[in-house]
């Protein structure tokens, strides 16, 4: 419920928002959360008429783990097979992604200098954990037909390395995908000052207004 406050800037701009819950790592291992988010997107499309959603302007957004899920939801194609358990046969198309300091390369967090305990727990002791990590890593889905992507990341983030954002946006540039990376100087894993938040949301809405269909 605390995350509902993150929706307020969008509501103030006249957006309709859906707050998505997903299975956490202490309930279900990867790729359950990714599957849940893909199914939630399909639910939005299926219920668009009832709630007045504009399916031509669907934006997915999240912070931290939610940032990773926003990226995977907007980037993973149906042929990857991670939406097979979802109800319905809708083919949702995301119009833009807003990624707040999300993971972009899961394998990077499983081994070596960037190893993070939360990533190790999320993958668990599954025998195919490396393959699953590849399947849920946004950097592996970069291609030219992706929606516009904007990321916000602090360059002193101790939880998700800032290099994850740099790596993703370099790949997006090479694929000629519309994208923007907002760097928060000395920013850690969220908790940015009010003046930075005003700057960030101004940039987000400018990016969306410029790149979404009218």
Model-predicted segments: where are they?
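Active-site-adjacent alpha-helix of alpha/beta-hydrolase-fold enzymes
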Residues: 11, 114-128, 156-180, 184
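Short beta-to-alpha linker loops that shape the active-site pocket of alpha/beta-hydrolase fold enzymes
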Residues: 16, 21-25, 103, 185-187
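C-terminal catalytic histidine-bearing segment of alpha/beta-hydrolase fold enzymes
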Residues: 152, 162-214
